[in-house]
Swiss-Prot record:
In the autoimmune disease systemic lupus erythematosus, antinuclear antibodies are developed with Sm specificity. One of its GO terms (biological process) is RNA splicing. Core component of the spliceosomal U1, U2, U4 and U5 small nuclear ribonucleoproteins (snRNPs), the building blocks of the spliceosome. Most spliceosomal snRNPs contain a common set of Sm proteins, SNRPB, SNRPD1, SNRPD2, SNRPD3, SNRPE, SNRPF and SNRPG that assemble in a heptameric protein ring on the Sm site of the small nuclear RNA to form the core snRNP. Component of the U1 snRNP. The U1 snRNP is composed of the U1 snRNA and the 7 core Sm proteins SNRPB, SNRPD1, SNRPD2, SNRPD3, SNRPE, SNRPF and SNRPG, and at least three U1 snRNP-specific proteins SNRNP70/U1-70K, SNRPA/U1-A and SNRPC/U1-C. This is Small nuclear ribonucleoprotein Sm D1. The keyword Phosphoprotein does not apply.
């Protein structure tokens, strides 16, 4: 399972997120998108070497996140189970009468050649 898919299941969980600039954010996840952008509510944000700031909501760009600190009570074994079965990729079926090759009609021709005899 991809990390982002796991994080998307963490809605309504209270977590601490450490950012790459050293800021720590503690809040309840309202959503995570495929770019790992994380949206939180009831947030306490502590900038490095500063006093904590209370915020109602906060959105964090995914590439600014260093790591998530998850609560110990989180049932990881149930969250990590892959609910969606993996879809096996089907081989493309050959187009009727065309075979598997590309044929002669592809490409840009053979160029001007190397100076052979002219016609």
């Amino acid at each position: 399972m991809k990390l982002v898919r796991f994080l998307m299941k963490l809605s309504h969980e209270t977590v601490t997120i450490e950012l790459k600039n050293g800021t720590q954010v503690h809040g309840t996840i309202t959503g995570v998108d495929v770019s790992m952008n994380t949206h939180l509510k009831a947030v306490k944000m502590t900038l490095k070497n500063r006093e904590p700031v209370q915020l109602e909501t906060l959105s964090i760009r995914g590439n600014n996140i260093r790591y998530f600190i998850l609560p110990d009570s989180l049932p990881l074994d149930t969250l990590l189970v892959d609910v969606e079965p993996k879809v096996k990729s089907k081989k493309r079926e050959a187009v009727a009468g065309r075979g598997r090759g590309r044929g002669r009609g592809r490409g840009r021709g053979r160029g001007r050649g190397r100076g052979g005899p002219r016609r």
